[in-house]
Amino acid sequence: MRGNLALVGVLISLAFLSLLPSGHPQPAGDDACSVQILVPGLKGDAGEKGDKGAPGRPGRVGPTGEKGDMGDKGQKGSVGRHGKIGPIGSKGEKGDSGDIGPPGPNGEPGLPCECSQLRKAIGEMDNQVSQLTSELKFIKNAVAGVRETESKIYLLVKEEKRYADAQLSCQGRGGTLSMPKDEAANGLMAAYLAQAGLARVFIGINDLEKEGAFVYSDHSPMRTFNKWRSGEPNNAYDEEDCVEMVASGGWNDVACHTTMYFMCEFDKENM
């Protein structure tokens, strides 16, 4: 404010000096010009508030503000369009069987059967099967050198082996050392041995686990049936834990490390 008053004072002084006559007066004429000096007045009072101006230009984009809180969950939208069909999935596990359905209607009657011709054909086939069975049995006995019953097949192996090796050989063929558990089986084995012209063979009886407690090669215990020869078993030299059969059908206990022929036994059900 003081600066403005000082400026006004200077301007007034200059204006006053300009009005004084100069040292060389000039004649007044028609061409004379008058000089006017405008001196600013004092600052007036504040005017009335003007009208609202036009909107200014948009300012610069400000910095990104902080992330606001999550808003409320919106309403469920409408169902969208169906997407593309996806790839075929892997095959699932087999489900449980369903309930048995109701019986179906009876079928139409079949054609009349010519039973007499069929019976005749079946009878002829039965005869052929019986003949083939007999021929096969003969081939087994004559060529293969085996003997058989309704449930067993016996094979005489002409290879000298110790008892343990003989048992392994029979097992490798799918059987075991022969086990005469009754009179019929013992008689068949003895006849087989005699017809082959052999004096003795290993059979599937031993007391390797417990002295004097003889068992068959399938580990079943001996019961009432036996064919021990007179004075047997005697466990001579305290080493006779295995059993042989002689051509007469009798049994002797012998040393297991002795080598001789042996007889194998096979179940027909497992053949």
From Swiss-Prot:
Protein name in the entry: Collectin-11
Signal peptide (from-to): 1-25
Q: Which residues form a coiled coil?
A: 114-148
A Gene Ontology biological process noted in the UniProt record is: execution phase of apoptosis
Kindly state the subunit structure of this protein: Homotrimer; disulfide-linked. Interacts with MASP1; probably triggers the lectin pathway of complement.
Q: Which GO terms describe its cellular component?
A: collagen trimer; external side of plasma membrane; extracellular region; extracellular space; serine-type endopeptidase complex
Any one Pfam family match given in the protein's UniProt record, by short name = Collagen
**Keywords on record:** Calcium, Coiled coil, Collagen, Developmental protein, Disease variant, Disulfide bond, Immunity, Innate immunity, Lectin, Mannose-binding, Metal-binding, Secreted, Signal
Protein's gene: COLEC11
Q: What is the effect of changing residue 169 to P?
A: In 3MC2; no effect on homotrimerization; loss of calcium-binding; loss of carbohydrate-binding probably due to the inability to bind calcium; not secreted probably due to degradation early after biosynthesis
Kindly list the cysteine pairs connected by disulfide bridges: 170-264, 242-256
Q: To which protein family does this belong?
A: Belongs to the COLEC10/COLEC11 family.
What SUPFAM superfamilies has UniProt attached to this entry? Answer: C-type lectin-like
Give the location in the cell. Secreted
Asked if the Swiss-Prot or TrEMBL record annotates the protein with the keyword Chloroplast, the reply is: no
Q: Where is the C-type lectin domain?
A: 149-265
